[in-house]
């Protein structure tokens, strides 16, 4: 049961003092993100609550005022059509996005450690990819077991010897972190199709509007530079490759970047549409693309258009049914051959999912010393791959307390604690591990920190509670061998009374504020990324070929685009989220244009120095 407290209506006390005095302790053994061990508020939170009172955002922080703000957040999410697909939900899957009212605060000095550690791990991950798909010195030197590499279904043998455009296998990487009394600890890498950047931006757009004065006064670092870096990196690598290697990249008429999505039933489909719109790139599915003469083309109403860069949100094994999973109906036949020919850049390179295996954590300290001559800044959770006899013996002694994790990708399902596996006897687990030890990795449990959150009571009021939390941060390659870490992240909170953090289990998210001593400039994405300003006649159209039946499409041939049309008495199926309304159509003929310039801070566009920018 999460511990909670009510905020009083007494305006004679300072908001910071009220919160610090009356908030109840978090469960024993868990770090309290709100307060220090002596009961006083941590500096970022003391400043946050003080700013609310002084600036008048919420008056004296009455439950009624907070409840009204929370209701406004829920209403804006509903109006924006922000959703998340839950596979286990038999009621249709798509649920409204769950966003906490209170942001998660990170002090400048704490973020500096996270930033350096995340950039280091991204550098290391890219170096590992270059090695296992290249000379494989890590295997010959005994730093990585060959059985772990070759036995992993995420290792793509067809790409052995592949050299990606620009030389980088990874352009984005997400890292999941847990905060304990000892600092921040890495528990997972997300390199296959790292999700969350779009949701983090949507969270920022909403929450910064609820606390506009505090957001400005606390000098929260902005998110758009990370997205500008992403689009710059995607655009730069093919240009470098074409110049240095003599390939046919880029296509004539301008660079064409697409976001490859599995489709509307994917759990993070809203994010795919949101990112495509925000970055000004084409949202496509596998059936929208074709390979001709080792080149990738987009099917449009006006004919085939060359594709230079694919930002994929499609799992590795589904990318190419000719060379990977033959039963894939969402991939692009011939994609790997086009990659090997140097005619298309795919980000991240298929095969990057290997780095997500929990078994790799135990080998990374040695690999970091060998490849980077560095110690890891951010430690990882203690892990034992049972495929090694010595590690298996040590791991089995911790089976009653450890998490049993699948070494390789698996069907949906949560890892379970050894002593809480229900009806299956512990000896059965020992037998299963002994039979196929390489399939299992044991990890030591970590107590998740508890983050403050607003919990409405259903009667127009509520309380401040706390929930177990986990932070995901994002690193973006800068095209020159370095990495930029998005100043913020994707904070996830566990459902009430649970310690497992999972959006599939009904968890929530929180905006993440990285505080700064410097004033952040406010510049639109287009200006930062070097993209041209959006023209007045920008086509507000939607990606249509695979999602909307022909009867729902009004072809605007004179303008080179298509717009969504709902004929009277007819509903398009499957329905499109509202964020699709301005996503570039397959038929749009202007590659690399930014999306329409929206009005107001809700869309993160502002004039420099105006103070209205929310991101």
Regions found by a protein language model. Give the residues of each.
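N-terminal helix-forming leader/targeting segments
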Residues: 549, 574-578
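Preference for protein termini
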Residues: 1-566, 584-587, 592, 600-607, ...
